[in-house]
Each structure stands twice: as C-alpha cells, then as structure tokens.
A protein has these predicted regions:
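Detector for outer-membrane/organellar transmembrane beta-barrel domains
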Residues: 168-241
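Bacterial Sec-dependent N-terminal signal peptides
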Residues: 1-26
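Outer membrane beta-barrel transmembrane domains
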Residues: 109, 117-120, 210-213, 217-289
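Exposed, low-structure sequence patches enriched in small/polar residues
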Residues: 3-5, 82, 201
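Short, well-ordered, mixed-charge alpha-helical segments that flank or form enzyme active sites
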Residues: 156-162, 204-206
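Transmembrane beta-barrel domains of Gram-negative outer membranes and organellar outer membranes
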Residues: 22-156, 171-178, 184-186, 230-235, ...
Length: 289
C-alpha cells in the first residue's frame, strides 16, 4: 500500500475521532447547561442586576456615563466596564435610557464553578453583557405632594457566556414607579435633602420546563443629600422572586458624586446581602449636555 493511501486512511480516522470527541464535548456542555440555576445567586454580578433607584424627576439634559467596576466575594472576582446613555425626548417629561456592561476579567474558585455548574474558572477573552433599554415618564411633579416617575425596561439577550454562568442569554423586563420628595432645603437652594422610593415588577426567562419565567416584585428606599456641587445618595433595594432559588437579592448602595461645569465624577460602593453575594466598587465619569 502506497504512502498516499496510508495518509488518506489516517486522515479519515483522525477526522472521525475529532468529530466524535467534539460531539461528546457538546453533549457534556448541554448536560451542564440544563443544571444552570437562573437566579442572581448562581450567575455573575451583572446577569440579573437590581434596578437602580431613581430620584423621581425626569431630567432635561443628555447624559453619557462610563464606569469601571470591580465586584468580589470569596468565590468570584469580576472586573467590567459599564456604559449608560440618557436621552430626554420631551422636556422634563419623557426620556430614554440605554445601558450595557462589558466584562474584561473574572476568576472563580473551583467550589463556585461547581456550585454554578459553570464551564470554566476564568475568561479567555472579553464578554459582552446584556443591553437594557428603558423609558421614563414623569407622571406627577408636585412640590406639595410627590414626584412620581414610571419606568419600563427590557433586557435583551445579547449577554454572552451562558456556559460560564456569566449572562443568561434570555430576555427579561421590569417596570416600576419611583417616588421622590424634597423634605428640606435652604433658601438659596445650595443644600437639600430628598427622600425617594421604588416599587415594581421584575421578570426574566429561565431554562426550567415547568416555570419558563421567574417573577419578582422590586422595592427600594433611599435618601439623597446635596450641598452645592457635592451629593451623596444612599439606598436599600432588592427584589423577591417567586422560585426562592437564589432569586432574592438585596443591596445597600452609596454613591458620592461631584459636579463641575456639567462634568460629574462619582464613586459607588454596594454591599450585597442575602442572594447578592458581591461587594462592588466603581468609579465613573458622566458628561452632561
């Protein structure tokens, strides 16, 4: 038998072995994916975020925000970029907000990987997160009573790395009402204290054949103090899911910001509780127009 035929047979055998090996690998991945738990406790820190607390006042200026974030707990350390675009459509009445995350690095412990049924311990390239698109509508603006804003968000399925339990690769949405009232301010308007709250509904798709989606109610309460160009906001927020499978995260957040000529620098710290396992730090820049 000539070398030509020997090489041909060897190539065919190698090709068949490669296809068989890949098929087995695919079956293993699919089997692991069926065990993923679609809740914030068993996914990365950006997969199913807790909605932010709004001041209940629709702004009439554009905002472009870039933020570097670091999330950590004993089983997962994650770094990502966060971007936000805020567009007023009707002066002080209607606005649109678009956000996205871009994870640059994460590292899991073997215990966390196994708990999440994730495919790996660290990323091999950057990971595009989910894009969220929201609308804000000023329902009521009253100094005597309350300011009320209605919000509706949809989360697209653009997030990557389902196998690594980073993003769910499934759509979701939430809507809520945010309430706000300024309870104290000086005559010059350079100092103020404002209370605000949130209540709404949160829903995301799952991989369960019994419950195709998880439903939750959202809530939050907070206070914002301002003095000249400096402001600090503290709030407590979370949501409570129907499944009770790690879908009841809580967070205590603090945001310190300073504005100068439509440029805002801000530092955020978030302390996760219950099914939110992470402490998070971020530094951001906002340009207003």
């Amino acid at each position: 038998m000539s070398y030509k035929y020997i090489l041909l047979i060897a190539g065919l055998l190698l090709s068949g072995f490669t296809r068989t090996y890949a098929a087995v690998g695919d079956e293993d991945w699919r089997e692991r994916a069926t065990h993923l738990i679609y809740s914030p406790r068993y996914f990365g820190p950006n997969a199913l975020p807790i909605p932010t607390l709004h001041s209940a006042s629709v702004s009439n200026r554009w905002e472009v925000e870039f933020r570097g974030e670091y999330h950590h707990y004993t089983g997962d350390k994650t770094k990502n970029w966060y971007g936000r675009l805020y567009i007023p459509l009707v002066n002080n009445r209607v606005a649109v907000e678009v956000t996205c995350t871009y994870e640059t690095e994460y590292t899991l412990t073997p215990e966390t990987r196994d708990e999440r049924f994730a495919a790996g311990l660290k990323n091999f390239d950057q990971i595009l997160g989910d894009v969220t698109i929201g609308t804000h509508y000023q329902i009521l603006r009253s100094e005597k009573w309350l300011d009320i804003v209605g919000r509706m968000y949809i989360r697209t399925a653009t997030g990557q790395r389902l196998a690594e339990a980073r993003f769910t690769d499934a759509a979701g949405y939430w809507f809520d009402l945010t309430f706000g009232k300024t309870i104290a301010k000086n005559k010059s308007g350079t100092a103020s204290l404002r209370l605000h709250g949130m209540a709404g509904f949160y829903c995301w798709m799952t991989n369960s054949m019994v419950h195709r989606q998880d439903d939750a109610y959202t809530y939050g309460i907070g206070v914002t103090g301002k003095y000249r160009n400096l402001s600090i906001q503290t709030d407590y927020a979370g949501y409570t899911g129907y499944e009770n499978n790690g879908d009841r995260p809580r967070v205590l957040r603090t945001n310190l910001s300073y504005e100068l000529k439509k440029n805002i620098l801000s530092f955020k710290y978030s302390h996760g509780m219950r099914d939110n396992l992470y402490d998070s730090y971020s530094l951001g820049y906002i340009r207003c127009f």
